[in-house]
From Swiss-Prot:
One term of GO molecular function: protein-transporting ATPase activity
Protein's UniProt keywords contain Cell membrane: yes
Annotated function: Involved in protein export. Participates in an early event of protein translocation.
Protein name: Probable protein-export membrane protein SecG
Membrane spanning residue stretches: 3-23, 52-72
GO terms for biological process, alphabetical: intracellular protein transmembrane transport; protein secretion; protein transport by the Sec complex
Record membrane topology: Multi-pass membrane protein
Subcellular localization(s) per the UniProt record: Cell membrane
Family, similarity comment: Belongs to the SecG family.
Listed GO CC annotations: plasma membrane
Main location: membrane
Gene this protein is translated from: secG
Organism the protein comes from: Treponema pallidum (strain Nichols)
Keywords: Cell membrane, Membrane, Protein transport, Translocation, Transmembrane, Transmembrane helix, Transport
Top-level taxon in the UniProt lineage: Bacteria
Length: 133
């Protein structure tokens, strides 16, 4: 699979270079690089040279897109290799009822509050309902 991917990638590079070359060779009123080699006339490939270059460019661009999509299909990530299932299984194994097991910060806070000595009058105010003198 890797060898096929490398071969298609190499072919894609060649097609890219051909597309660039063909686009540069096409003349637009004799201004392009094609005019430099043929003196501005369209007689390099006969009377239909522009249509030949244009059609060849279309074919190469189509080949470029086809190879690009095929290469993307070859190199796509696999659907589900079991990694998702393994992660879900691990999560299920380590899942705990969080409301029954408070975090360490809550336990520390509970211990600090239990060590806090409240004045007896304060406890009496709340416990017996007596008023403040």
């Amino acid at each position: 699979m890797a060898v096929l991917s490398v071969m298609i990638l190499s072919l894609l590079v060649v097609v890219c270079l051909l597309v660039v070359t063909l686009v540069l060779l096409q003349t637009e009123e004799g201004d392009g690089l094609g005019g430099m080699f043929s003196g501005g006339s369209r007689s390099a490939f006969g009377s239909r040279s522009a249509s030949v270059l244009t059609k060849t460019s279309y074919v190469m661009v189509g080949l470029f897109f086809g190879l690009t999509f095929f290469l993307a299909l070859l190199n796509r990530a696999p659907d589900d290799t079991g990694l998702q299932k393994a992660a879900q299984q691990k999560q299920a194994e380590t899942a705990v009822e969080w409301w029954k097991h408070p975090p360490k910060k809550v336990l520390v806070l509970q211990r600090l509050l239990s060590l806090l000595v409240l004045p007896q009058e304060f406890l009496g105010l709340w416990g017996s309902g007596s008023s403040v003198p």
